[in-house]
């Protein structure tokens, strides 16, 4: 088989396997069979991309997991500057390095970008050292606060080809890459 799919159907706890073969001569269908039966049948060819996926295609690619509506503070720290924003009532205030009204749209936009940010690739599942990714001393670290809960993401060096930036969610060991635009706004002084 070209692709093997393991699945469980409904309340049945038994794992089944669907074996997907090559396309038919006309190219409109795919040969298929279940692992426990000799009978070969056809499935529609438009399903081919559904079956032919890599592990990365199926994983949750969010860079951070958080409830956007519960975020009540943001801390941004870089080598150049740092800032803290706190939500009071329905508005955002900069509380560090000085106390001032913050641009609601800019702060909410940042939260939105972090919430919808996606991994481009996995650089290392459990790296021995963060130095080669520039994460031992990150360029920028963002911490989102929701009551007593905190979640942080650090951004390090650019990838060799410049198409991505290494990042790490503090709650997971893996190092992944993200689009550079996700980091650019974070480097601006508050």
Task: Give the ranges of each region predicted by the language model.
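A short-motif feature that recognizes glycine-rich, charge-decorated loops
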Residues: 1-190
